Structure formats: structure tokens, C-alpha cells
Amino acid sequence: ETAAAVIQENEDGSAKILSSIVSSQIEEHEKFGGVVPELAARAHVENIDFIIKKALKVSKLGIEKIDGIAATAGPGLMVCLTVGLNIGKSIAAFADKPFVAVNHLEGHALSPGLEKEIKFPYLLLLISGGHSQYLLVNDINKYEQLGTTIDDALGEAFDKTAKMLDLGYPGGPNIEKFSKLGDKNFYKLPEPIINRAGCNLSFAGLKTAVLRESKKINGDLQLRYNLAASFQNTVNKILKKKRKRQ
């Protein structure tokens, strides 16, 4: 997605989202079964100017009222991130405003407290794309990693499972959608390293088990739904159990 938002900091330190505009690229990438970096970057270039202007319009603020500009600096696809960074820096320079490069994962870690007060420290399960982590968020810029994946990221496992079951792109939402039509207890799937101490995760074995079962389906639609539901249910059980091992 290409996105822009205007955030207001209130006197008490809380925040208010004045506008949040998102342009999705899902239809563009759906035909390829995943994100094509070059196409994504081109779409960002085509959409970002309009998105920023609309965010300002919805917020009812002119650029002169904005105190600072922030843009995601990583982690992520640099060919895409560069688009936002360049335009963010350009706007900041033109408007004589400070520019802040934001860590993508730190944004996820702190966003739960954007409009609702959450007191530090708190335990965070961060599962975003190629990242699967349990973090102890002690304060802004103070994070302790309690566990991470030792092989595949959960996002990859969802995408690969959706592909194995021919459920289409994007994998996560489609698995969630079709899981509602299946029996989550139909397949007994492995929960890798679930009894190992600590909060580390592993999804390679689960992904292999799904591949093995998917080859036995032979086009049976209900079995595909059952396997999707069983996969999602197994993931939920793994995450809940590991949460208690911190």
C-alpha cells in the first residue's frame, strides 16, 4: 500500500489521527501471486503525490501547519521505501520542516498506544511480513527481543500455505476467509519446538506438513478449507502457548 497520515499530538501527550489515506496495490500484484518490487515502486511513484495531498485535505491543515515530516526508512523493500523517503525529505526541505526516518517495526511496536493509552512495559507479538518476534517494549527506543523465528517467518508460512492450497493472493486474508468454511480440528498438524524453553518460533516443519497433506487433497474443495482452518488454528495455538514462556 501507499499511505499517508496526519497525526496531531495533544497537550496531554496523547495522539489523534486527523487523516489516514491508503491506496492498495493488491489487484496489481494478485495476478503474479505476490509482490513484484518494481511494480510496487512504480505504483508508489504514481500514487504518493495524490495520497499526501488528500491526507492534508482531509486533515484540513496546510503544509505550513505541519510541525514535522516522517517516512519509513526500513526494514522493507528499498526500491519501494526510497520513494517515500525521497518525497518526505523533499517536502521537509521545501517547507523547512524537520525530517524523521522511522523504523518500520518500531512503528508497529508503538502504534497500539497511538490513540489508546498503554503503559510501559508491555509484551508485544510482532508478526509483520518477514518478521515474527516477541518483544518487551520498555519505552520508546527501549526494546528487548524475547524470541524470534529460527527459520521461516509466519507471513511466509501463510503465503506459501495459501499457494499450496490455491487460495490466491494475498495469502493471510484468504486463509482467514476460507478457514471459516473448514473444520479447524480436521488435521493434526505439528507445533514445532513448542516445548522448548523460551519464546523462539519455528514454522518450517508446519509448512512442510501442510505441503504433505495438500498433495493428498486431489482437488477436494472441502479438504482445502479444512487444511486452511487447521493451519490457522495450529498457528494460533503456537502463538498463545509461546506467549506464556516469556
List each language-model region with its residue ranges.
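Nucleotide and nucleotide-moiety/phosphate-recognizing core
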Residues: 59-65, 87-104
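Short Gly/Thr/Asp-enriched flexible loops that form oxyanion-binding sites at enzyme active sites
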Residues: 71-95
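Glycine-rich phosphate-binding loop plus the immediately following alpha-helix
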Residues: 128, 139-183, 207-208, 212-217
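Short beta-strand segments
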Residues: 20-22, 70-72, 103, 123-128, ...
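N-terminal beta-alpha supersecondary unit
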Residues: 1-65, 71, 75, 108
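Short beta-strand scaffold segments in enzyme catalytic cores
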Residues: 2-8, 124, 132-136
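Conserved phosphate-binding catalytic cores of ATP/NTP-utilizing and phosphoryl-transfer enzymes
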Residues: 101-123
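A contiguous, well-structured pocket-lining segment that forms one wall/lid of small-molecule binding clefts
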Residues: 20, 62, 176-246
